[in-house]
A protein has these predicted regions:
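Boundary/linker segments of alpha-helical solenoid repeat arrays
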Residues: 4-12, 91, 151-156, 196-197, ...
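A compositional/structural signature marking long, glycine- and acidic/polar-rich segments
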Residues: 181-286
Length: 490
């Protein structure tokens, strides 16, 4: 934060005293001092964005959260004014103009692209506050910034890669934009063959394509490429953990969850939960690594609860709720906690192109279902059965068994009144059933289910993520449902 503060103060010295300083008649050139002030404005807006991001990540009180929001708005207004100017006849095409354009493309593109992902009702509120979100325009601005030789081309490229390989995948319907990501990556991979960040995104692209072994190699190479930035290693560990999850290699996945729990401060509760979850997937008599016990680990999860901007992250809340049953003296085990969390990160889409990986998951679910049916009924029985039905439906959909997948999703929906704890299951079952309808051309039926999932269910686990996916599915159908949109902030 301190270097950013110094940078911000430095740019303040060169900034314009008032907005009118850039108003010129057509053909009238700006002075060198005025041009310098415009570049300082772009740098200042960028600093505000970065400081806001750090505020959201580091500080844990509402006052700091509000301050971060003010920085974001001030940054946006500066970018908006600069964008208006460079589009005007007054804009001077000097030797450094391309760098100013790159900075403005980054800011305008980032705001438009990010805000376009919000559902219409929330976007209307943001537009009232002076923001706007246009996905296509945001993408075009970032592409312009990434493909021209300017100081912000790298930032534009990295933001696009995040969008193509993470945001569209995790908050969308699970496709990702791999072709666009690889096209963008190609020149950077040639220029920086050992660039850690580009190895990471290349690994992410391979994982989305279902090439899990290739992804593992790239993530491992990314770790080897640099040793200074440990947080980057943690990003790779997280991806490696999921890669081994897709392969059902529980011990290796546990190994990376253990590394994260020991080294990373991002979400200790999540890492401990995943460690316990992986151990629970091992056979009862199988030796546990480091002598750890999953029941003890599940009981520890809530002790690592944290708050960001006054609230716990949704993924932590979910993990704590799921682990709560282990507080009992004779706890009822979770049937497939790893696969349930994998669903929350859209992991079943990762294995959709790999029949053998989907089959491995399906067999794990079939065995868990057998154990559940043979066990005495308890207060969690119906919820656990519905978890398995939802996940089996995803596997069957991946295998092309559409009718069987629909039956699984409908079983969850029809059990709505019997579900006691996992209320997220029904809206997600409706979402997945609608995706099946979209894939099979039943557009009107899909829209009805999506609207029902969006409007009839509130205050369930991971609601924001589900609502974003619903919005993405509706956008895919180009359905105008702005009057019914509701969302809980992430």
């Amino acid at each position: 934060m301190t270097p950013l503060a110094y940078s911000k103060q430095g740019h303040l010295r060169f900034r314009r005293k008032s907005p009118s300083n850039i108003s010129k008649s057509p053909g009238e050139h700006l002075t060198e001092e005025q041009l310098q002030a415009l570049h300082a404005d772009a740098c200042y807006a960028e600093c505000l964005l970065q400081r806001a991001a750090l505020t959201f990540l580091q500080d844990e009180n509402m006052v700091s959260f509000i301050k971060g929001g003010i920085k974001v708005r001030n940054s946006y207004l500066i970018y908006k004014e600069l964008h208006t100017f460079i589009q005007s006849n007054s804009s001077l095409q000097g030797p450094n103009h391309i760098h100013l354009e790159g900075g403005v493309s980054f800011g305008i593109g980032a705001f438009n692209l990010t805000l376009s992902m919000f559902p219409p009702r929330l976007l209307k509120v943001l537009e009232f506050a002076g923001f706007s979100g246009d996905k296509e325009y945001g993408l075009s601005q970032l592409n312009d910034g990434a493909t021209t030789n300017n100081l912000r081309s790298m930032l534009c490229a990295l933001l696009l890669l995040c969008y193509y390989t993470f945001l569209t995948f995790i908050l969308g319907t699970g496709e990702g934009d791999v072709a666009d990501a690889e096209k963008l990556l190609k020149p950077f991979r040639l220029r920086y063959p050992q660039g850690a960040i580009f190895l990471f995104f290349a690994g992410r692209a391979e994982a989305i394509k279902g090439n899990i072994d290739e992804a593992v190699v790239l993530f491992e190479d990314g770790c080897k490429a640099q040793q200074q930035w440990k947080q980057f290693h943690h990003m790779c560990y997280w991806e490696l953990m999921w890669c081994f999850t897709y392969k059902c290699v529980w011990r290796m996945a546990y190994f990376y969850a253990d590394l994260l729990s020991n080294e990373s401060r991002w979400s200790k509760a999540m890492y401990v939960y995943m460690k316990a979850a992986y151990l629970s997937m091992l056979a009862p008599g199988e030796a546990r690594p480091f002598g750890e016990d999953e029941v003890d680990l599940f009981r520890q999860v809530s002790t690592f609860k944290q708050k960001i901007a006054g609230k716990s992250p949704p993924t932590e809340k979910f993990a704590i709720r799921k682990a709560r049953r282990y507080k009992a003296s004779c706890p009822v085990r979770l049937p497939v906690p790893v696969l349930e969390m994998m669903y929350m990160w859209n992991g079943f889409s990762m294995i959709s192109k790999r029949p053998e990986l989907t089959e491995g998951m399906l067999q794990t679910l079939v065995e868990a279902e057998r154990i559940l049916l043979e066990s005495p009924a308890n207060e969690y029985s119906m919820d656990d059965r519905c978890v398995i039905h939802l996940l089996k439906g995803l596997c069957l959909k991946n295998q092309g068994h559409i009718r069987a997948a629909e039956e699984c999703f409908n079983k969850v929906y029809n059990s709505e009144k019997k579900i006691r704890f996992d209320h997220y299951l029904v809206p997600n079952a409706l979402l997945e059933l609608s995706v099946v309808y979209i894939d099979t051309g039943r557009k009107e039926e899909a829209i009805k289910l999506l609207v029902k999932a969006k409007t009839n269910y509130k205050e369930y686990s991971m609601e924001s993520r589900t609502q974003f996916r619903i919005h993405a599915a509706l956008s895919k159908l180009k359905a105008d449902t702005s009057d019914q949109d509701e969302i809980t902030p992430l």
